[in-house]
């Protein structure tokens, strides 16, 4: 299927690793001009070199694939503004915005402080809102845009010992669902992609933390976790990138306001 997005420009937040990188790779494979944004400049440059070697600058024509490395702290207003401005300067107006961010610290709901609640919004809501605010007006004016947020299965099935994440991501989901209805007439879609247990560094860190907390081994934790997944395995990052690219595509123009699960059947609710 031709996804119809070759030559479009995407800013992919926190894309120097994990799920953000998986989405960036999937978009690059479709000929999208991709801004690799993160705090690790050297890593961002490595990824750009990798993508250019794989797909070649302009391999989809004069308006085709390219990539740029942008060092920015997207938890700050200055970092957000810089990332948006540099993406536009180097690659053109932003057609696709992929919202993503670092996972907050683990912790139980019963022991959350007011500072923890504030941190959930500072990390998982305010930066994403700021990015949307910078990019959305141009999308509406051009009457084409895709906003995709990388969420968590905790949005629909709160995860144990991740109270800050569950709180902040649920708030973001509410904002995005509301926004989707407001901008649909402008041909801008807004969606959320919910990963289950995808084999990323973040998931491994959480498994290590669980093993330490319970006094067992990483292997035992992962075996136990796999048993809760109907597919009986963790997903591969590329298996997350593929549906992400589709939700950012031209054929997905009638899909908006959804929270799509990519979880191997992990979430049991309807």
Regions found by a protein language model. Name each.
Residues 9, 16-18:
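Conserved glycine-rich cofactor-binding loop
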Residues 32-47:
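Conserved glycine-rich Rossmann-like NAD(P)H-binding loop of the short-chain dehydrogenase/reductase
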Residues 103-105, 110-132, 144, 148, ...:
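Catalytic Tyr-X3-Lys loop
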Residues 110, 157-163, 232, 250:
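Active-site loop immediately N-terminal to the catalytic Tyr-X3-Lys motif
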Residues 137, 181-182, 253:
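Alpha-helical segment proximal to the catalytic Tyr-Lys
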Residues 148-172, 176-185, 197-198:
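Catalytic loop of short-chain dehydrogenase/reductase
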Residues 157, 245, 256-270:
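Short C-terminal tail/terminal secondary-structure segment
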Residues 184, 189, 255-257:
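Short, small/polar-rich loop/turn modules that mediate ligand/substrate recognition or access, typified
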């Amino acid at each position: 299927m031709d996804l119809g997005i070759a030559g479009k420009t995407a800013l992919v937040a926190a894309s120097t690793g994990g799920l953000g990188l998986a989405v960036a790779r999937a978009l690059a494979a479709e000929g999208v001009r991709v801004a690799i944004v993160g705090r690790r400049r050297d890593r961002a440059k490595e990824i750009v070199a990798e993508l250019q070697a794989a797909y070649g600058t302009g391999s989809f024509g004069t308006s085709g694939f390219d990539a740029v490395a942008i060092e920015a702290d997207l938890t700050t207003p200055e970092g957000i503004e810089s990332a948006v401005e540099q993406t536009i300067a180097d690659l053109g107006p932003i057609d696709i915005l992929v919202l993503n961010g670092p996972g907050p610290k683990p912790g139980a709901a019963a022991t959350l402080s007011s500072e923890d609640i504030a941190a959930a919004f500072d990390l998982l809501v305010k930066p994403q809102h700021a990015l949307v605010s910078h990019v959305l007006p141009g999308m509406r004016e051009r009457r084409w845009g895709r906003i995709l947020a990388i969420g968590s299965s905790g949005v629909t099935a709160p995860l144990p010992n991740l109270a800050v994440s569950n709180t902040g991501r649920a708030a973001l989901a509410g904002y995005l669902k509301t926004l989707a209805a407001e901008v649909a007439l402008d041909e801008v879609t807004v969606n959320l992609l919910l990963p289950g247990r995808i084999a990323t560094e973040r998931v491994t860190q959480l498994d290590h933390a669980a093993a330490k907390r319970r006094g067992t081994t990483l292997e035992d934790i992962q075996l136990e976790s796999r048993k809760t997944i109907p597919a009986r395995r963790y997903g591969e990052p590329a298996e997350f990138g593929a549906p992400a690219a589709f939700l950012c595509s031209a054929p997905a123009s009638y899909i908006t306001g959804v929270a799509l699960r990519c979880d191997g059947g992990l979430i049991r609710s309807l």
